[in-house]
Amino acid sequence: MTNSSSSASPTPATSSSPSGSDRLGLTLKLLGWAVLGLLPLYAWTVSTAPIDSVQGMMQKILYVHPPLAYGAYLGFVATAIAGGLFLWQGREVHDQLAIAGAEVGTLFCTLMLITGPIWARGAWGPGNWWVWDARLTLTLLLWFVYLAYMLLRSFTEGDERAARFSSIYGILGVVLIPLNYWIIDLVGGAMHPDNLEFEEESSSLGVGMGLPFFVGNLTLFFVFIYLLVLRWRVGMLRTEAERAEFDSRRN
């Protein structure tokens, strides 16, 4: 993960105060307990879910793949919102949240790009590892966009102008998310069902498949929030340490 922060903040006492990182620490503990409670339930519901008569065991990736997509989208939206707040207020806490959103979102997007082809190959045969489906292609583009964001932050650490440029970049990049959602309805897809079809299939899963699908979404949502807050807190603690070191040298 990148180790980047902007060099200046108009309100350092507010944006990087120890009490702020302490609150994030408490939130992190609560989220950790929630994740620990949900993971066994998630594993149990997936393992006991009925096996699909057509796709077999590969169908169980349904309980992982869509939740990963939602996590990726949430991460990139968090980057855009936090970037907008940073441009408005110039506070380090928002810049660190933007970085955290991009990194965790890219992690989820990477796992989504891995699980999707595995599912396709298992369901439709060896020739379907990768098909240039419209949504799949846009997802790959989305991955490259936020990978570039992280590389930019890595190579421009401590540059406030780069932080502001990255904020604008993150806001523009998030436009790909609604496009990614609607692209199947606009041009169709070779692998993904259209949105109405997916919603109808999801609502008609029944208890056997519907419960693990719901628990999977809930669990990976909490995993996403946990990782987001963890990375956010690490960034804030690093910023506080750097500021304290700078103050000690100045004094």
Language model features: what each stretch is:
Residues T2-N251:
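Polytopic transmembrane helical bundles with strong interfacial aromatic enrichment
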